[in-house]
Amino acid sequence: MKRGQKWTLGVGIAGAVLGAALLAVAWWLPTDKEFAARLTAEAEERLGVRVTIGSAHWALLPRPTVVLNDFRTRQTQPVVIGQLTAHLKARTLLDRKPVFGRIEINDAVFPRNSVRVFQGTAGASKPDTGDGDSVLLERLEFRNLTWVSHGGIAVIYDGEIDFDAHWRPRHAELRRPGISPPFTLTLKRDGDADRWQARIHVGGGTAHGNVALKSAAGGTLHLSGRLTPIGIEVASALRSFNRRSPVSGKSSGKTVLSADGKSAGELAESLRTRTVFSVNPATILRVDLEKAISTLGKEHDGQTALQELTGQLDTQNTDNGMRAIYTGLKARAGKRSVTGEATVHRGQVEASGILFLAEGAIGAPFTVSGPVSKPKASVPPASYAAAVISAAALPVTGSGIGARTGDAPGGPVEGGGQQPVAAAPVTAKEN
């Protein structure tokens, strides 16, 4: 027999064997209706909540494929998957240990408050890791996936993840479709090490760096990383995630991040970041400090231009959403300067600081509070009078003599020092 004929015969025999195997598998598999019922029961056991599946379909040819349509959890804010398509490796079905070559998720909604319920369920929080170094899922693709934050802010993402063993991403990319300037986050693994190069494009700038994962006793994972934000327009960056920023301007700095947990969900929930930043120049949006002072707080709508803005931003994911804490804030607008601190959480801002009308002047304490979209500024009455006098005197004397007549709560504040300031009336008292 010729060599070519032998190869042809060999391929034919192999094809026949594979066909017989697939027929055997088909014999084991249920009807679509039975299949949907089995998947529903399995999902409810793993997730710990009731679920519904609109329809389910499986096919062995031309390749093993499973399609789910209209998956929903029975929750106040349901988790929804419009369509999930899973492509299986045919050879792995024979061992009853299926491996997914690719899973595609389209038109999904993941409310953060609903997903958190699954973290306490072992079946959802601890996916099967397979045998040894086996890979149970090679690639995950998602399109039009909406993540809904604790505060109800919906953000749509597209992305892909290629997995190595133990669910380690080999390559991952996350995008915000239709956003300009674009947002992309890319992770690339360094060989087999639990270390990844991170490249982020957002707000017209970049934040490149690296992240690493370490395993500790008891199965706890520790995530750490460093990023270098460069030229990121703050308002544009937050607008990319359907959020409003209190300031605008291009920011640069250094960021460190960390998280601890036993699963990806726990790592995300515990994520902490610290960024030392500078924005030069910057603009405070929706608050005109000059107007607030000159009108004794009756008017404050507008903006405040700053020659520079520096400080430290700490973020912490909590059960009630992300908390952002600004400390060591220093801003300069011409001869005037401001120091202070602020906390932003659940759409509310609470800030306090000291306004210096001229170099060396006594500071006028102020507070800013309320919704981020429309905060209110407040200055103690005596300081209002001082601020108005100083504002009139500055063009003439070139100094802040008038401001020194102010009486801040607890005594005058000299130089650049800070002290806590309580909310004050918005009208000046008569002496």
Language model features with spans:
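Flexible, surface-exposed loop regions and adjacent strand-edge segments
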Residues: 116-123, 290-296
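Flexible beta-edge/linker motif
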Residues: 57-117, 128-145, 265-267
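Compositionally biased, proline/threonine/alanine/serine-rich low-complexity intrinsically disordered stretches
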Residues: 384-431
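Short, surface-exposed polybasic-and-hydrophobic patches located at secondary-structure transitions
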Residues: 119-130, 153-171, 386-395
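Small-residue helix/turn framework positions
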Residues: 64-65, 69-72, 101-111, 166-391
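N-terminal type II signal-anchor transmembrane helix
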Residues: 1-47, 402-411
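N-terminal "mature head" segments of proteins
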Residues: 35-49, 63, 103, 135-142, ...
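A short, amphipathic edge element
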Residues: 47-54, 307
